Structure formats: structure tokens, C-alpha cells
């Protein structure tokens, strides 16, 4: 893998990743030496503290202006074919591209608003980095339609971005995710994901860290390794098993077709995965995406997130890297909505058993690649 870093006319950086025939791209300086700069003219987002829930939220009003469901010929993530109508990606072709989001929730190169001293209503600059990762120049592709090698290349890019963004002194957590389908709020259909380099550890991950730490202190074991051992022994909730990777519908699933994907070996982050583990993970992600699409015979919407250890310098050896998929469909023509009990009480209601949904996914093709 090689990288070529360029700067867009508005000041945002863009990184081309080359593999195979394009692997002759020149190497570039890591982001730790060249901190990313946000685009000029972008209003500075602000972090605001919720004293009731004791967690941060972000106010980024300029995101109201982001692109909303453009026609395919106006897609900003397709390669530039006509110099008179440039897209976000100037090159006419590419493998994978990562660049600063035009409408970021966190930024790193602006004059930030002053931090408030109000004990109740705390606020401070939303300092961080928001990137877009475009998986392929093919507007109609998906993780399921990409080759295993292409997904493997994507895993490599995720690991690289995790390492470089995590090395920035103001970043405490590198959060990788993909939103797929209008049912989960997608406004651009070109296959892509995003990365948020947070200045704090997000609440969902904080809770997982606390549980994993407590379990290790109590039992001497990794909580997630313990869960995987039980799932393999039982088998009813497994969706697929690879040499180095497992996928399951959790016993504690909140979404009907929720799937968690784990490396079998205890690793805490993407950069720690071996070459064989990265390839096996790519196979698992491609197979799972194919199962989702074949389940009801249409492109299956989902939210995919990567949970890995923080980059805050603390010892998080008790944690376990994994992917989580949250599809909103509960049947072919019905969606699960978050309503009163989920939003107001924080308790998820599941209209099906995880065992039943795992069986449906096991039986859906493909079974291997």
C-alpha cells in the first residue's frame, strides 16, 4: 500500500491509497507531522456538556447545508470525469480515497470559540478530525459486490487511518463507521464510510470499557473472549465462522438483525491485526454484507461501527476489537423505529429472538467466498 497526499483548493487534504497496479504512488508524511487543517470559512462546531447525562454533545449548525441525495451525475464522490465539473475527488480513477469532510462535526485548524467557565453549561471547541473514506470509484458498488481483496484493502486503510489519526495529540478515540441506505439517513449513495477522530472517548465505548475492565478484574479474563467462547460452544447465534473471525447475533441484541464481528485472537485495535487476520476479516465482512442483501432481495440498509481501544495513552489491554452492524429492518417491509421506551427509558425492545434471526442469516447466501 502506498499513499499520495494532496491539498484541495479549499485547504482540505485528500489522500489517495494505491494497491496493486496503483501501488507506485509516492509515500507521504504522516499526519502526526502534518496536522490536518479544516476548510476556510467553515463555522467552528462546539462541544456542549450535558450535566444531566454527564456526556458531551456537539453543535455543528453548518451541517444543515450538506449535500442531500443528488442525482448520480452530480455525485460528489465519483471521480472527476469532466474538469469543468470537478467532484470531491480530482483524479479520473482511484482505488480508495480518504479526505477531510466538507461538513465536519469536529475540526482542527480554526479559531475556536472561547471555552466557557460556566459550571453548569460547559462548552469548549469541538477539536478533532472528520474524514470521508470512499471505497471505490464505482457508484453502484457495495461491500458485498467488492472483491475480497478490495475489502482487504479497505481494512488496510482503516488501520492506517486509525494509527495516524490516533497519533494526533488532541485525539482520544478514532471511530470508524458506515451508514448505508436512506432508512438510516444516508444522503449520498456512493459507497463510502466516515471516520471521526474524537477529542474524548464516546459514551458507548466508555460503557464497554468499564464493563470489560470490571470483568477482567473479577475473573481475570477478557469479557469478549468469554462471550465468544460461550457463543462457539452453543452455536445457536453464530452467523459465520472463519479461521480468524467470528460473526454472531448477540444474546443481548437490540436490533433484529444486529451482528457483531470479532477477531478470534484477543486484539484491541485494527493496526494489531496480522495479514492473515485482515484477509479473513475482509472475507467475513463481504459474506455478511452479501447475506444482508440476499435476506430480502434488496440492498440492506445498516449502520456499521468499529469499536477499538482509545488512543488516550492509557492501558486498555482488556478491550477487544469488534465491528457492530445495526440494520433497521425487522421484516422485508417494516422498520424498527426508536420510540418512547428506547429513547426515553433507554431500554431496547426486540420483536424477535436473536436465535431466530441468526438462523435466517446463516441460511441466507453466500455461505463463503
Question: Where do the protein language model's features map onto the residues?
Answer:
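HIT superfamily nucleotide-processing domains
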Residues: 1-369
